[in-house]
């Protein structure tokens, strides 16, 4: 049967991928990083034994994290990406010509180096002159920033363990809100509403204490075990369904998943999520 790589999702569930070859395995100052080439998902980035992204389905995650916010914010000249060392989120940001400055804050330089070396199809915007890449802890960056303002903030964090755990703190979200322009939009990955429902609900509560408009939305990401994933759109103004058509039209042709119809559909929540959130 060959070699398989398993990620343990909980005490009762594992996801396994059949491996063709291990391309990289090493430890940074923060975490263990691997890249494997698989039969079904192509090249896969793994951090501390957790699947992060794959060539096969990364677009489902990165497009849905970035494009709903970028299509609804009144202005997108300045964008902050926190995390996202594989390069997929900044790729999506820099598809927009209206973006003049994209700051990416990543704690682990090795993740970026490994992604540049082995995940060429995901991180295609590393050489864009609008990208300002800074290697610093995202929580510390937000805490220290006094007067920097952004039109859009995208939080592309890992699961709430290891160095990514602080990206789920309410104090971190409050700091991000302080850095937003008055009409700014923040979007973040907010875990699975199946396997991690308690964390999903608590994240929504934390965000609701800070923002007037908090709207979770759902989509499929097969690599993440449960098959369904969530992101959350946040702002003090605006409405997530009121997209700027011209901005959408400019990027839809080059998108694998995102389009005008999908934008409307993903914000429709199933009953079990509505009940959990008491909507």
Please report, for each region that a protein language model flagged, where it lies by residue.
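SAM/dcSAM-binding transferase cores
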Residues: 1-34, 205, 226-279
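The AdoMet/dcAdoMet-binding core of the Class I SAM-like
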Residues: 2-4, 28, 53-185, 195-199, ...
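N-terminal glycine-rich anion-binding loops that anchor highly charged ligand groups
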Residues: 33-43
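A short, structural micro-pattern
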Residues: 39, 106, 225-228
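Glycine-centered loop/turn positions within well-structured domains
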Residues: 43, 140, 239-241
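A general beta-strand register signal
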Residues: 46-47
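C-terminal substrate-binding/active-site "lid" region of AdoMet-derived donor-dependent transferases
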Residues: 164-240
């Amino acid at each position: 049967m060959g070699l398989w790589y398993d990620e343990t999702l909980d005490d009762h569930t594992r996801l396994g991928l059949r491996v063709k070859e291990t391309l990289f395995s090493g430890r940074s100052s923060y975490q263990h990083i691997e890249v494997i080439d698989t039969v079904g998902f192509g090249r896969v980035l793994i951090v501390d034994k957790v699947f992060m992204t794959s060539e096969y389905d990364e677009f489902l995650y990165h497009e849905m994290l970035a494009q709903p916010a970028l299509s609804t914010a009144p202005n997108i000249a300045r964008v902050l990406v926190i995390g996202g060392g594989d390069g997929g989120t900044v790729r999506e940001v820099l598809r927009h010509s209206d973006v003049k400055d994209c700051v990416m804050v990543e704690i682990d330089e090795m993740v970026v180096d490994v992604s540049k070396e082995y995940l060429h199809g995901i991180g295609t915007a590393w050489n864009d002159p609008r990208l300002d890449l800074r290697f610093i802890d995202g929580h510390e960056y937000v805490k220290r920033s006094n007067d920097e303002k952004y039109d859009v903030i995208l939080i592309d964090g890992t699961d709430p363990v290891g160095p990514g755990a602080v990206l789920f703190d309410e104090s971190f979200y409050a700091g991000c809100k302080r850095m937003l322009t008055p009409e700014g939009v923040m979007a973040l990955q907010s875990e699975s509403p199946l396997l991690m429902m308690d964390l999903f609900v608590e994240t929504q509560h934390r965000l609701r204490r800070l923002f007037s408009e908090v709207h979770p939305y759902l989509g499929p990401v097969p690599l993440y075990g449960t098959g369904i994933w969530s992101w959350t759109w946040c702002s003090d103004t605006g409405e997530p369904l009121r997209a700027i058509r011209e901005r959408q039209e400019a990027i839809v042709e080059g998108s694998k998943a995102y389009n005008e119809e999908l934008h409307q559909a993903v914000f429709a929540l199933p009953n079990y999520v509505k009940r959990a959130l008491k909507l």
